[in-house]
From Swiss-Prot:
Tissues expressed in: Testis.
HAMAP family reported for this sequence: G6PD (MF_00966)
Species this protein is from: Mus musculus
Record-given protein name: Glucose-6-phosphate 1-dehydrogenase 2
Membrane-topology descriptor: Peripheral membrane protein
Annotated positions binding D-glucose 6-phosphate: K171, H201, Y202, L203, D204, K205, E239, D258, K360, R365, Q395
Length: 513
């Protein structure tokens, strides 16, 4: 058994600092101005300010980093602190550090479509670094409706003339291929691709990165990672909660846009892509684009849509269905669950179904990749053997394990299912790594774009799903109902069986969710 390693947060941060400071792309001595556009909003309050605080607390930001909030609301830094501090989870011992953090914060009031406001912002930023070399990082925590005006004004007025400029853009990146192309063309006309960071919070999960190492650093997997040995691949993203009063926003996009076309499609690329020439960002993203180009538009016959209804035995939120959310339009047919089958039409994966499924108000919280291997040829054990599976689970508890057949103790050849545990968490016990948001923000400071979506990736992803989305919006099919807290609609299980997946509900492994 591997020796267990227990590292404190201080030790982990020390290792990360050493890695960062040895990285030429991490300009430790430079002045950095981190500008939060939309600083008065929920995203800034709940995610961005807390993330910047955690990085500052742990000494993972360049020493001369200043944070500037920008929004229309008449606020002060004290107001920002009151709004965001409850999400910082700061301990009493961290109060002095917290006060130091807010001395590096400032707030500028301005309009999003007013050139004069941006001239004022630019003057303020320049005063911070007093004409010295400085790098500007703009986080657009804004609705997409104002992206065009904001990016145009930033490019015309607020760009650093002495350092680098980087723009962080939040999803959704459009609603379909046409709107996405329109937004991409606009942003690409203003900034180079190496300045654009389209953030997908899911892409920097530690286990998502580990998938690449698992595939390409272990010879044992290379010969079997193909359609000759794998019968199907299942990519799952399940949430145990519903819209919880925020259905109005969700109803505009639905589960396909929210999860499937983004998170799950990115996971599919990492499973299916060929080995990149290097681990450089563009080499990895080149291979992901090649995979996407091999996928045809999703066919309606290979899609199941569902919408949760209240659980008659449930309590609180579980007793309510999607349509009981007062913010959801009456009679909405928006899907809260979707299962779709895609095929990668190349030599490695020809004929192998990639089953994508995601949903809200399901029976558990889980995100995983499951590769199910083909049946044993020439079975001598009287069909008692189950299919082998390799499971890479991202949440809730990161795990890597494979299910295998071993002999049951006794006189005769009775196979039974067991696990071969590859989970690195068993070795690195209680090691707390930075979360996805922290890692992604650090990537922006370092100029690493591997975990950000490139323009051509975005275009290919929308190409695959746009015809389906338009058909759904045009015809408004009634989604299959499923009870809050269930596995989802039974029709989805039938679709999975139809394309070759075998459900093994009898096996109870050691990896509880």
């Amino acid at each position: 058994m591997a020796e267990q390693v227990t590292l404190s947060r201080t030790q982990v941060c020390g290792i990360l600092r050493e890695e960062l400071y040895q990285n030429d792309a991490f300009h430790q001595a430079d002045t950095h101005i981190f500008i939060i556009m939309g600083a008065s909003g929920d995203l800034a309050k709940k995610k961005i300010y807390p993330t910047i605080w955690w990085l500052f607390r742990d000494g993972l930001l360049p020493k001369e980093t200043f944070i500037v909030g920008y929004a229309r609301s008449q606020l002060t830094v004290d107001d920002i602190q009151k709004q965001s501090e409850p999400f910082f989870k700061a301990t009493p011992e961290e109060r002095p550090k917290l006060e130091e953090f807010f001395t590096r914060n400032s707030y500028v009031v301005g309009q999003y479509d007013d050139p004069a406001s941006y001239k004022h912002l630019n003057s303020y930023i320049n005063a911070l670094h007093q004409g010295m070399q400085a790098n500007h990082l703009f986080y657009l925590a804004l609705p997409p409706t104002v992206y065009e005006a904001v990016t145009k004004n930033i490019q015309e007025t607020c760009m650093s003339q002495t350092g680098f400029n980087r723009i962080i853009v939040e999803k959704p990146f459009g609603r379909d291929l046409q709107s996405s192309n329109q937004l991409s063309n606009h942003i690409s006309s203003l900034f180079r691709e190496d300045q654009i960071y389209r953030i997908d919070h899911y892409l920097d999960k530690e286990m998502v990165q580990n998938l690449m190492v698992l595939r390409f650093a272990n010879r044992i997997f290379g010969p079997i990672w193909n359609g000759d040995n794998i019968v199907c691949v299942i990519l799952t993203f399940k949430e145990p909660f519903g819209t919880e009063g925020r259905g109005g926003y969700f109803d505009e996009f639905g589960i396909i846009r929210d999860v499937m076309q983004s998170h799950l499609l990115q996971m599919l690329c990492l499973v299916a892509m060929e080995k990149p020439a290097t681990t450089d960002s563009d080499d990895v993203r080149n291979e992901k684009v090649k995979v996407l180009k091999c996928i045809s538009e999703v066919e309606t016959d290979n899609v199941i849509l569902g919408q949760y209804v209240g659980n008659p035995n449930g309590e609180g939120e579980a007793a309510n269905g999607y349509l009981d959310d007062p913010t959801v339009p009456r009679g909405s047919t928006t899907a809260t669950f979707a299962a779709a089958v895609l095929y990668v039409k190349n030599e490695r994966w020809d004929g192998v179904p990639f089953i994508l499924r995601c949903g809200k108000a399901l029976n558990e919280r889980k995100a995983e990749v499951r590769l199910q291997f083909r049946d044993i040829p020439g079975d001598i054990f009287h069909q008692k053997c189950k299919r082998n599976e390799l499971v890479i689970r991202m949440q809730p508890n990161e795990a890597v394990y494979t299910t295998m057949m071993t002999k049951k103790p006794g006189m005769f050849f009775n196979p039974e299912e067991s696990e071969l545990d590859l989970t690195y968490g068993n070795k690195y016990k209680n090691v707390k790594l930075p979360g996805a948001y922290e890692r992604l923000i650090l990537d922006v400071f370092c100029g690493c774009q591997m975990h950000f979506v490139r323009t051509d990736e975005l275009r290919e992803g929308w190409r695959i799903f746009t015809p389906l989305l338009h058909k759904i919006e045009r015809e408004k099919p009634q989604p299959f109902p499923y009870v809050y807290g269930s596995r989802g609609p039974t029709e989805a299980d039938e679709l999975m069986r139809r394309v070759g997946f075998q459900y093994k509900g009898t096996y109870k492994g050691t990896h509880k969710h």
